């Protein structure tokens, strides 16, 4: 308890980075595991009323909101906790069974959407009314080990503001027996240069990365291997050394949508190796992210070799240089309605097994896409910058023409964890540091030695962050400055600015509620 109290004191000291000199807000902690190595799935999201959701793995019983969270019987399970805007504990929902939550999003009415992965034959969700729902994860025969193992399926759940489970859907990856003989990780077989990120005895997977609510749709980005029947996605199998049968499946990424009842799933885009690869050359996408701009998804991905972006509007092939010096890890931005007109940011080839390429978030602000991630070697967004270590970055890209407004790379070895934009500030975090940039020009305003696992904000009014310390999880919500819309400076030409109900700027009014601010500062709400 003493250790947790010290954490909360340190946490309060960092709040000034969000709230100015006042440092007001609240901070709470809980201890869900006995060993810090078991902490995972650490995420947070803040709702329109300022209430805060937090997720974590857990393997020991603990109290929350005056009740015991369902005993996981030692299983590394997951839980979702809710606090009100003042930090009071409200409720907990448990997911008992080996699983992990990877992303969360909250609707304006307080409804919570979670995206995770089940790694167990069965995961039981227990809501606040005691209702139980099982996530079934069927076992399959692993040809190499001749035993049955569970696939790592993706699951998506809708929980109302009172913690009552509304609906759930799963995506179960299938092994194509006519193509795939063995699935696994070459590292487990002593092969270097692995391009696979799952264990040798895990056949296939769906790994959610991001979930976004826009209008009446839920958008999800995910990594996958194998075939996903519900979306029509196919694995991109490796014909290793020209053998007649594939023995590995190269990771792919996709974006799909569903309605808010988690029905009517539809594929939007996939990024995969162009053809069945016959060598261990690194032809694969590394990561994916997206934004929804004027109701249209725009994807961003990093990858190398021969890749194909496929959407309902068509497809686009890419060929990124592979040389003796390594691989050109390019960053690509594309409108899913016009995949044939992407913006490609190339980089000089780099050859380093430990290179990290990742996008942790992309969001819209003032007509720009603000993104954060990690790279190694030559910086795709600024080729004058080259690093001999993995470093985090933050960048601003103009949506109208995909030109780079500015791009900043870290000076120290680091990996990006999360990012949020609050008005004229970008808060980007690594595991052990928090950086504050000015949105307009990327100027570094402040840096603190306290990293975050995740962060969330709503309309510049509410914010939540979450991080770990030893085997505990800390959630804090600083008191924010006035709404970014209230503080917005009118464009010099006197143009009217449009926002959706979440405070995201639009190029024009969209269907539904719109907030309009005129040059003289007058705001009004209209329905289109």
Range-by-range predicted roles:
Residues 1-4, 528:
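Positively charged n-region of N-terminal signal peptides that target proteins for export
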Residues 9-18:
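Hydrophobic h-region of N-terminal signal peptides that target proteins for export
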Residues 20-482:
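A sequence-level/structural motif corresponding to short, flexible coil/turn segments enriched
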Residues 72, 136, 507-509, 526:
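Short linear motifs in exposed loops
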Residues 476-504:
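Residue-level detector of functionally pivotal "anchor" positions at catalytic/ligand-binding pockets or at interdomain
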Residues 511-513:
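Extracellular Ig-like/FN3 beta-sandwich strand-entry sites
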Residues 515-528:
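C-terminal tail/sorting-segment detector
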């Amino acid at each position: 308890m003493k250790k947790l109290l010290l954490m909360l004191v340190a946490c309060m000291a960092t709040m000034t980075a969000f709230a100015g000199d006042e440092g007001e807000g609240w901070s709470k902690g809980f201890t869900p595991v006995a060993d810090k190595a078991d902490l995972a799935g650490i995420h947070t999201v803040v709702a329109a009323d300022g209430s805060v959701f937090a997720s974590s793995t857990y393997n020991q019983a603990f109290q929350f909101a005056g009740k015991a969270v369902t005993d996981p019987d030692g299983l590394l399970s997951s839980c979702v906790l809710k606090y009100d805007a003042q930090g009071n504990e409200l409720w907990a929902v448990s997911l008992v069974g080996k699983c992990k939550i990877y992303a969360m999003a909250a609707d304006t009415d307080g409804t919570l959407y979670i995206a995770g992965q089940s790694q167990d034959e069965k995961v039981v969700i227990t809501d606040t009314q005691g209702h139980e729902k099982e996530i079934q994860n069927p076992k399959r025969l692993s040809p190499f080990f001749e035993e049955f193992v569970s696939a790592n399926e993706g699951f998506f759940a809708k929980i109302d503001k009172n913690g009552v489970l509304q609906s759930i859907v799963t995506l179960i990856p299938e092994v194509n027996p006519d193509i795939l003989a063995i699935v696994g990780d070459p590292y487990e077989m002593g092969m270097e240069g692995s391009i696979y990120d799952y264990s040798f005895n895990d056949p296939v997977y769906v790994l959610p990365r991001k979930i976004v609510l826009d209008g009446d749709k839920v958008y999800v980005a995910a990594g996958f291997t194998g075939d996903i029947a519900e979306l029509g996605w196919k694995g991109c199998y490796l014909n290793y050394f020209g053998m007649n049968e594939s023995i590995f499946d190269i990771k792919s990424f996709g974006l799909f949508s569903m309605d808010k009842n988690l029905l009517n799933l539809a594929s939007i885009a996939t990024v995969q190796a162009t053809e069945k690869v016959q060598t261990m050359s690194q032809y694969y996408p590394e990561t994916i992210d997206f934004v929804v701009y004027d109701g249209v998804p725009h994807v961003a991905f990093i990858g190398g070799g021969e890749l194909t972006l496929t959407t309902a509007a068509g497809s686009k092939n890419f060929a990124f240089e592979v040389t003796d010096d390594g691989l050109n890890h390019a960053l690509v931005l594309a409108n899913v309605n016009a995949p044939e007109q992407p913006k490609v940011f190339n980089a000089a080839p780099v050859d380093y097994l430990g290179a990290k390429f990742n996008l942790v978030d992309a969001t819209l602000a003032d007509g720009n896409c603000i993104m954060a991630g990690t790279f190694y070697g030559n910086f795709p967004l600024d080729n004058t910058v080259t690093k001999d270590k993995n470093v985090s970055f933050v960048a601003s890209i103009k949506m109208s023409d995909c030109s780079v407004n500015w791009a900043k790379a870290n000076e120290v070895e680091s990996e990006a964890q999360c990012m949020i934009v609050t008005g004229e500030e970008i808060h980007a975090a690594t595991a052990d540091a928090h950086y504050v940039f000015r949105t307009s020009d990327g100027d570094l305003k402040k840096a603190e030695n306290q990293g975050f696992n995740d962060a969330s904000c709503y309309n510049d009014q509410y914010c939540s962050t979450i991080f770990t310390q030893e085997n505990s999880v800390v959630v804090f919500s600083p008191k924010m400055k006035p709404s970014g819309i209230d503080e917005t400076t009118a464009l010099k030409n006197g143009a009217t600015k449009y926002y959706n109900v979440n405070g995201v700027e639009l190029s024009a009014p969209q269907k539904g509620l719109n907030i309009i601010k005129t040059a003289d500062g007058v705001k009004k709400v209209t329905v289109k």
